[in-house]
UniProtKB/Swiss-Prot annotation:
Plays an essential role in the repair of DNA double-strand breaks by homologous recombination and in the repair of interstrand DNA cross-links (ICLs) by promoting FANCD2 monoubiquitination by FANCL and participating in recruitment to DNA repair sites. The FANCI-FANCD2 complex binds and scans double-stranded DNA (dsDNA) for DNA damage; this complex stalls at DNA junctions between double-stranded DNA and single-stranded DNA. Participates in S phase and G2 phase checkpoint activation upon DNA damage. The modification Phosphoserine is found at residues 555, 729, 1122. Its main location: nucleus. The modification Phosphothreonine is found at residues 558, 948. Residues 1321-1330 have a biased composition (Basic residues). Homodimer. Part of a FANCI-FANCD2 heterodimeric complex that binds and scans dsDNA for DNA damage. Interacts with FANCL. Interacts with MTMR15/FAN1. Interacts with POLN. Interacts with UBL5; the interaction promotes FANCI homodimerization. It comes from Mus musculus (Mouse). The C-terminal 30 residues are probably required for function in DNA repair. Pfam families: FANCI_HD1 (PF14679), FANCI_HD2 (PF14680), FANCI_S1 (PF14675), FANCI_S1-cap (PF14674), FANCI_S2 (PF14676), FANCI_S3 (PF14677), FANCI_S4 (PF14678). There is a cross-link at residue 522 (Glycyl lysine isopeptide (Lys-Gly) (interchain with G-Cter in ubiquitin)). Keywords: Cell cycle, Cytoplasm, DNA damage, DNA repair, Isopeptide bond, Nucleus, Phosphoprotein, Ubl conjugation. Residues 1299-1330 are annotated as: Disordered. This is Fanconi anemia group I protein homolog.
Amino acid sequence: MDLKILSLATDKTTDKLQEFLQTLKDDDLASLLQNQAVKGRAVGTLLRAVLKGSPCSEEDGALRRYKIYSCCIQLVESGDLQQDVASEIIGLLMLEVHHFPGPLLVDLASDFVGAVREDRLVNGKSLELLPIILTALATKKEVLACGKGDLNGEEYKRQLIDTLCSVRWPQRYMIQLTSVFKDVCLTPEEMNLVVAKVLTMFSKLNLQEIPPLVYQLLVLSSKGSRRSVLDGIIAFFRELDKQHREEQSSDELSELITAPADELYHVEGTVILHIVFAIKLDCELGRELLKHLKAGQQGDPSKCLCPFSIALLLSLTRIQRFEEQVFDLLKTSVVKSFKDLQLLQGSKFLQTLVPQRTCVSTMILEVVRNSVHSWDHVTQGLIEFGFILMDSYGPKKILDGKAVEIGTSLSKMTNQHACKLGANILLETFKIHEMIRQEILEQVLNRVVTRTSSPINHFLDLFSDIIMYAPLILQNCSKVTETFDYLTFLPLQTVQGLLKAVQPLLKISMSMRDSLILVLRKAMFASQLDARKSAVAGFLLLLKNFKVLGSLPSSQCTQSIGVTQVRVDVHSRYSAVANETFCLEIIDSLKRSLGQQADIRLMLYDGFYDVLRRNSQLASSIMQTLFSQLKQFYEPEPDLLPPLKLGACVLTQGSQIFLQEPLDHLLSCIQHCLAWYKSRVVPLQQGDEGEEEEEELYSELDDMLESITVRMIKSELEDFELDKSADFSQNTNVGIKNNICACLIMGVCEVLMEYNFSISNFSKSKFEEILSLFTCYKKFSDILSEKAGKGKAKMTSKVSDSLLSLKFVSDLLTALFRDSIQSHEESLSVLRSSGEFMHYAVNVTLQKIQQLIRTGHVSGPDGQNPDKIFQNLCDITRVLLWRYTSIPTSVEESGKKEKGKSISLLCLEGLQKTFSVVLQFYQPKVQQFLQALDVMGTEEEEAGVTVTQRASFQIRQFQRSLLNLLSSEEDDFNSKEALLLIAVLSTLSRLLEPTSPQFVQMLSWTSKICKEYSQEDASFCKSLMNLFFSLHVLYKSPVTLLRDLSQDIHGQLGDIDQDVEIEKTDHFAVVNLRTAAPTVCLLVLSQAEKVLEEVDWLIAKIKGSANQETLSDKVTPEDASSQAVPPTLLIEKAIVMQLGTLVTFFHELVQTALPSGSCVDTLLKGLSKIYSTLTAFVKYYLQVCQSSRGIPNTVEKLVKLSGSHLTPVCYSFISYVQNKSSDAPKCSEKEKAAVSTTMAKVLRETKPIPNLVFAIEQYEKFLIQLSKKSKVNLMQHMKLSTSRDFKIKGSVLDMVLREDEEDENEEGTASAHTQQDREPAKKRRKKCLS
């Protein structure tokens, strides 16, 4: 039979073939095809012949062809055919589809839909035919009557697609079904339907099946719905990641985790590669991705940005055209996230409305961790982004050798966080990916070497962290060694940071150490001073960190880096003898540098103590070096005055005078080394011969210091040739030399005071010597102060910083104020009897703390050891606190004879600084710090006390002090003390938990002070109100507070209409005639601006959320109702309340007779701001008012309030300001300065007026639009007809200033008209909103 069919098919006509096929039964023909197909015998030829004999032009032929198609589809789906045979059959069927009449095409397509619905398909191979059938059906323009209504081919196609998308798709041929639609021409509606269907199927698949489905979906997206496809993929993986994190965090469900992390992240990586590849082929897809993610920034960023989408963006940076846009988007997202976080943390009002989301920085660091799962396509983007953040947001400016941030406090904090995030990205990437470590290290070091004019501390910190993590990465040491070649060209601070960072590597790499020493030796003899400084810094660092065998262990180690982290025994690599020889060679090199400039010597003297303490076996060499140096400037004759050759310390070079030898620092170094030797070495000595020689050296040094002490006390001003008649001007060589010598003497006196205190053992004679040394110090200090007052500038801060160590300052204060031991009383009375010495001790303490605030460390031994500094701060604070609370300022000042601040006031100033320092540098140790100040009981009791409770205890002490001060007579009010107390309370209040009862008590107390105590001191009022506002915003919104204050200001200053009598309110006594303006007025306006910023932020938030909801409605309408986060209705209500209260606030202020100047200017700007915010709120309702809820009543009331209570009085205030300007008095020729001042005031006050009028009119314009759109008359309370009763002309200002008589008359007439128009408004009482 098959042969006959084939032979008949060769005829030119098909008549015989058709006749023969008609004689066959359908089952016979189907069996023939099946047999041939299963056997694989030229089934294609047979099928081609059968189709040739079944023309669609005839009804029988078309039906037979339809049955053949059905039979072949079943054959292909049976799985009995070989792959090539099945493909051949499908190929032939595809070629013949377009011949089918429309009704049969509908039937064929319906068969496929039924097969999918009933899950009759086995392998889905036949689905390749479906797109051809649908395409052919869409070409049928005629109406097809198939029992389903009269529709044309395109409409049937739409109906079939709709049906197909509504049935359940079997999981095993999901991918084939999706690929069906890529070859079908789809309308946007059909496309959305298909995409939504495929996206809903993601959750029903195994993880490994998702990437190929995503690939098909991306191919399909070239037809449209790109944003829906991307949004759906991102949303799916966002939820999957979230679910995975929740499962991992729950121990109970650890066995039920849906998928292992490895599998999930590998799948995500594959999907990201598919998307990036699709974007390379279809750039529009990339643009849609960026548009989608940018739009998401306006609402809730966490709905768009997640670890998956961030990883996708970072992978996208490999496509050059998108690189810059992606990094800009990520930078914006990071900065916005940090700003939002800070805004939320600083406002209780926002915290109650907006839940805190996951920060973008956390997501990025999660991407870094996930990138370990073969995300090589992400790592390069991570590295680039890390460096972009560090370059963009690192410190930009160096001031006095210190990196300085530029901008507002908010932007500074944001920049610091962004820069730190960049460093964390790079460090974590370095830890995870071995392949890119070299690149990260090279880029960091390139920036360290090339950026000599900008701060690079953040890069040095990163470099140090990298080495600390992996000190054994010797394969990278070649790049570090190359960097050493640039040391001589780098700033000293950079060199020190770089060398500290590489310490661990120097300990384990001999070649690196040798390379560094070679560079340092060359630098030691360089012509540039900075290069020699770098060499000295490097050698000192090596001496500190390469211990000679037998050195004492240092419990006071300042540089834990390389000592605790790197567990490498140096002596296992280098012998003890070699190490000692190496260190002694360095000391010999440093000895030669003692003949160089003062700056070099200074570095050595400041560094030798640390070397000695860390490497005690070098003590003999170091002390011998110092001894030899001192002998050059020491007068050995015991009766010779003065005991030091001060002239030799000063060098004259041509016409210039320089300090050659910092003798005071030399003595300081010797004194500290001696003290260390006596406390650490002497107790361990065994009496060896070498030790006896050392003992002789130390004894001789002691004798020299004793002799210097005695002779310095005996020396008079004339002995130094520096009496009061001497020249101290900075313009002559003699004057400069005398200044240098005087400063040296003062430094020597300080060193000797500390030395004698350390050996005194509370001896009365020693304390008398200390007081005599102080008298000598005071003489020169007074002379320099007196001469500096007459001359130009004082000496530089380098020599004016006190040489007393922080430890000594702490011990001295404790002895002076807290030592109550009976045996010490007589000797201490010597020091305590001198008020000037007591003042000096506290002043030096303040100076040391100020130095710590300024630089982060203090001069002297242990000045860079954070632990030692912290311990000294605790001791100092405890003493200052006791002294201030025990002897109040009022008591001390009543019997005070000395000029200047009292000791109690200085103690309070010290307390204010120490509290600030601890919060700035020692935040993690606050609990320990407060515990040191207040011993409350046993250790068990101490452990249960929180930081809030401890801080509250301290706060109460200062509250009592402030209350006592405020309760005193007005003449006894000490403004300086009050300001310091407020500053201390402000600092301590930051330690209180805002939800605690202690915080509420602090707020209530501050409120009570503001309400009950009236002080006319503007500075005190400003500090107190700032404290009040800073507390209030963490408790609730301050808008009602602002309204009450505005009423008080209005009552104190009066109305702009002098005929109106104001009913005074007394909410806050702190608001009085002296403080109401400008102090309180500017404060409340500033606070109102912050509230408006918060409201603007909320409006942007709900506006973005509305956009997101609109987009999500298009994709998944069923989810729209569930997307109620954040609760926009609550936010809208809160916004209305805020704006309504602020309208009443401005209503009061705008009617207040404010003095000319900053108050008027700031108020006009504030009014412009509230109208801009109102306009933004109206625009939001223009966007959402089409929803069923329409315009809420509260919004209508807000519009009514603004129209009746704000806009009219705004115009009155504008006229008031302009009239005040026009009433400026005439100025004679002699008063030109006054004219210029008047001009500046007029220009400043009237400049914001056009902006305000524009803001009002914009608000009214959008109100009109909203009225039309919402069918609600919102303009009924806006009096447009009387809005302009004045003119805004620049020429008016000139007229005022020129005092032209004719113009003056015209202006007066205009004012009269204005007066007449506004008369009814002025007669009403201004207390309607109180």
